[in-house]
Amino acid sequence: MADEQPQGNGQGAAQQGEQPKQQFQIAKLYLKDVSLETPNSPEVFTGEWKPQVNVDLTSKTRALQEGHYEVALTVTVTAKQGEKTAYLCEVTQAGVFQIKGFEDAARNGLLGAYCPAQLFPYVRETVNSLITQGGFPAMVLQPVNFDALYQQRLAQAAERQKAEQAQGGGAEAKGSDSTAAQGSDTQQ
């Protein structure tokens, strides 16, 4: 009985001086760019409010130093009353993420889906705040499935690469990790 020791306290590797194999950390979150344009105010406030609203979302990734990446999520919301733009709101929320010890596919998944999902609540709050401060009704952005967008982007890239190979190009598709989504709705 005296020879038995507790197993698996989760600190064995750290106590032996080894670094954990996988590390994920949010190093910094920041508002990178923000704008609200209301080109037709105050006239836009005089009529009935039944705008056509379009939401565009993009995510871009760039490598910084070893194991550090910037992910920038941009949301552009455009509301039109007929042919006139009521407002154009654009917010870019960014973060620096430390990602070490992951295989390429897992790291790319974190950068392409998980990191933008961490930034989205900040974008949602900033967009809503700007639009209401501009005198317009609240604009609550609906949830976004970043995992599905990332998988869709991977499938599109694979199809592009397959088409290029079929045409004899054979070149690999390169570019920054990004996701894009568009939506249109009528705000009431």
From Swiss-Prot:
Q: Which domain of life is it from?
A: Bacteria
Q: Which InterPro entries does this one have?
A: SecB (IPR003708), SecB-like_sf (IPR035958)
Q: What's a Pfam family this protein contains? A: SecB
Q: Which GO terms describe its biological process?
A: protein folding; protein tetramerization; protein transport
Record GO terms (molecular function): unfolded protein binding
One GO CC term on file: cytoplasm
Q: Where in the cell is it found?
A: Cytoplasm
Predominant cellular place of this UniProt entry's protein: cytoplasm
Residue ranges for the region (Disordered) are: 1-21, 160-188
Locate the compositionally biased regions of type Polar residues.
Answer: 176-188
Quaternary structure, per UniProt, is: Homotetramer, a dimer of dimers. One homotetramer interacts with 1 SecA dimer.
User: Which family does the record claim for this protein?
Assistant: Belongs to the SecB family.
State the function annotated in the UniProt record: One of the proteins required for the normal export of preproteins out of the cell cytoplasm. It is a molecular chaperone that binds to a subset of precursor proteins, maintaining them in a translocation-competent state. It also specifically binds to its receptor SecA.
Q: What is this protein called?
A: Protein-export protein SecB
What broad taxonomic lineage does this protein's source fall under? Bacteria, Pseudomonadati, Pseudomonadota, Gammaproteobacteria, Chromatiales
